[in-house]
């Protein structure tokens, strides 16, 4: 179906309201099959802007949740900016925006607590939680050298020891001592770049005042 949708998004047909039903169905397929197509989803939101009467809260919620699965990319912000302010204050959209804010500001424990109270939001969304955990692992990987075992488990959504070990194995993290997980040596990860700029400047070819004019003004020869 992705190929067919790609054809619909070309040229003036991109914002043809007659294609909206097909595009909305495509959003549902993405949710169920753990697929993702930002271009198609943005087209749906743009069609809602052009045709406010066609707005579907459920489809918009699915688009926002799918955008969260692609953090740290800016997809969520792009989608949010295309939703009318009045619609952003409606449920469940306002709840999803709050979840997005918690993730973007790295309040991971608060995110899982808020999500636990709104698990119905994930109905029909396959792989959402694991996609969020990938983002959390990305943040941990660029932030920590060592992290407490209990803290990582909390940040990942209160995972069991076996579940946490699976993620640790995936990212090459090891428990070097009881209760402490080694992430990486951040100093070794930093790769400084030396930038050398060579400027050819033939001072002898210029008149004396043009070489150091400020000095010559203070100390005339």
Language-model regions: role of each:
Residues 1-36, 50-62, 66-221:
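Charged, E/D/K/R/S-rich low-complexity terminal regions of large eukaryotic assembly subunits
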């Amino acid at each position: 179906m992705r190929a067919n949708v790609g054809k619909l998004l070309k040229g003036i047909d991109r914002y043809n309201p007659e294609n909206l039903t097909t595009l909305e169905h495509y959003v549902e397929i993405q949710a169920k099959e753990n697929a993702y197509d930002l271009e198609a989803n943005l087209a749906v939101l743009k069609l809602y802007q052009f045709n406010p009467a066609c707005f579907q809260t459920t489809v918009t919620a699915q688009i926002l949740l799918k955008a969260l699965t692609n953090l740290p990319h800016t997809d969520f912000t792009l989608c949010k900016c295309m939703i009318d302010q009045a619609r952003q204050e409606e449920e469940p959209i306002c709840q999803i925006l709050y979840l997005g804010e918690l993730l973007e500001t790295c309040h991971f424990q608060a995110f899982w607590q808020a999500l636990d109270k709104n698990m119905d939001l994930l109905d029909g969304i396959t792989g959402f939680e694991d996609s969020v955990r990938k983002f959390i692992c990305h943040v941990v990987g660029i932030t920590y050298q060592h992290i407490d075992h209990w803290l990582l488990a909390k940040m990942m959504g209160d995972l069991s020891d076996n579940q946490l070990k699976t993620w640790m194995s995936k990212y090459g993290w090891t428990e070097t001592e009881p209760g402490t997980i080694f992430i990486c040596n951040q100093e070794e990860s930093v790769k400084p770049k030396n930038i050398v700029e060579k400027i050819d400047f033939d001072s002898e070819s210029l008149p004396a005042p043009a070489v150091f004019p400020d000095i010559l003004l203070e100390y005339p020869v």
